[in-house]
Amino acid sequence: MRLLFLVLLVLLGLIQYPLWLGKGGWFKVWDLQRQVAEQRETNDGLRARNTALEAEVRDLATGVGAVEERARSELGMMREGEVFVHILPPGTPLPSDNSTPQASALSKPRPPATPPRR
């Protein structure tokens, strides 16, 4: 009787091995489910990013307003006749008087460039 019990216990162990540790066992399935969940999160984030980029491309292709907004914010461009006003945060020291001569030096017209002699 004891021998029969041991044989059945060994057979049970042999049957359980592929279920838990085999090629398609539970540990492998759990790991694959975790990988699928991570990939779904990544895909959702990329899908949202693609939607935002598509909207931006659509705006840039159809409207002048988006191009103008981008030129103003990223390149600092202004329309002719506009005045740039820079509001300093509280506690920021005011620019010194030394900045005025630099601004006037920049506004002086340059002499025309002469071509190099050959």
UniProtKB/Swiss-Prot annotation:
Q: Which residues lie on this side of the membrane: Cytoplasmic?
A: 1-3
Location in the cell reads:
Cell inner membrane
A Pfam family in this protein?
DivIC
Chain positions covered by the region annotation Disordered: 88-118
Comp. bias intervals (Polar residues)? 95-105
Coiled-coil regions in this chain?
Answer: 28-62
Stretches assigned to the Periplasmic side: 22-118
Q: Where are the transmembrane segments?
A: 4-21
Q: Which keywords accompany this UniProt record?
A: Cell cycle, Cell division, Cell inner membrane, Cell membrane, Coiled coil, Membrane, Transmembrane, Transmembrane helix
InterPro entries given for it? Cell_div_FtsB, FtsL/DivIC
Q: Name one GO biological process term.
A: FtsZ-dependent cytokinesis
Q: Where is the composition biased (Pro residues)?
A: 109-118
State the annotated membrane topology for this chain: Single-pass type II membrane protein
Q: Which GO terms describe its cellular component?
A: cell division site; cell septum; plasma membrane
HAMAP family in alphabetical order: FtsB
The protein's assembly and partners: Part of a complex composed of FtsB, FtsL and FtsQ.
Main function: Essential cell division protein. May link together the upstream cell division proteins, which are predominantly cytoplasmic, with the downstream cell division proteins, which are predominantly periplasmic.
Which family is it part of? Answer: Belongs to the FtsB family.
**Which NCBIfam families does the UniProt entry name for this protein?**
PRK00888.1
What's the protein here called? Cell division protein FtsB
According to its UniProt entry, this protein's organism is: Bordetella pertussis (strain Tohama I / ATCC BAA-589 / NCTC 13251)
